[in-house]
Amino acid sequence: MAHFNECAHLIEGVDKAQNEYWDILGDEKDPLQVMLDMQRFLQIRLANVREYCYHPDKLETAGDVVSWMREQKDCIDDEFRELLTSLGEMSRGEKEASAVWKKWKARYIEAQEKRIDEMSPEDQLEIKFELVDIFHFVLNMFVGLGMNAEEIFKLYYLKNKHILNVKIMDIKQKFYRTYIVKVRTPKGVFWYAGKHESFIVNPYNDKYPGSGKILWNIYRKYGFNYKIRWSKCHGSREKSYEVERELISALKRKHPDTCINISPGGQGGEGRKWTEQQRLEHKLRLNNPETKTRMKNSQRIAQNRAERKARQSEVMKKFYSNGGNKKISEGTSRAQRKAPHWHEPLKSEIHELWVSLGKPATGPVVKALKGKYDVTSSALKNLIYLFRKEDV
């Protein structure tokens, strides 16, 4: 039986565990696979130290696997008894706690009727730790068969789909979450907090980068160099708004100079609204001759910076180094100079294709012609316009 204090002290590393979990999701890794790898490593290390322990990668025969599985089942049975005892409040001591399942104990009825939510946080945590101890040996069973997280999910999904005849993706539930974005720029690190609603179970599969106006200006200028941390689901829109306000308030206290939230949160942000007086003052500043001269000079300097020219040159070299890009670019320019330039029977062929696609814009037509005719949307623009005009 694990003693109460031995498990309780583990909570001291909860921040590290939380950060590790966020990092795993942020790196698009599977937490279950990480746990399987950890458990496999632990068993390999144990086998290397104690030769009488099984090595999970050396289970070759059915007999080896039977022995391995039986060991895990024995360990699970032992941990299950500890789990039951922990439900009697381990802070009372193991002997008193066992009254929850020992009917001959005087405290049996009292222990049986005790509500879980009335137990101390430490006792509730102890129960969860005991369940995790069982999970160690369940993981070992998967490791012994060489199964990974993807295979476990697929087989679990197929098994339940067959039994219940339901599809997980058909269950439409909206999730109300809050998040914190940490975005890195050449000017430093900035923070943003917000709220998001989606039907996606795992928010890290959402690819949602936040919605703040300043945040998106940063993305447009410096790219999507950010990390996002999601909260659990709050259950309702109202609760998520409440938590959003608390998050923004906390960020502004902790990072007063680098928190880029404009609004305090709660109902979404429309940005900072100017008064009529502020609008007038801004208009006067923009029309000031000195301001115009300063802006013009700044623009000229920016356009002539060596770094900017080098970057533009690199982009164009990369574009024209690809023969296909060069061909398309030259073809587009020629089409724009000489349009309309389509002749029969090609014109009729494209018209039939355009009609069969439901008379769309240029994009779908370009995709349909790919491989047969290398054209761009710009080259087709005038032709599609002509088709629409003739249909009227």
Swiss-Prot record:
This is DNA replication protein. May play a role in viral DNA replication. Found associated with a viral DNA origin of replication and with host membranes, may attach this origin to the bacterial envelope to initiate replication. SMART domains: GIYc. It comes from Enterobacteria phage T4. Transmembrane segments: none annotated. One of its GO terms (biological process) is DNA replication. Keywords: DNA replication. The lineage of its organism: Viruses, Duplodnaviria, Heunggongvirae, Uroviricota, Caudoviricetes. Residues 322-341 are annotated as: Disordered. InterPro entries: GIY-YIG_endonuc (IPR000305). It comes from the Viruses.
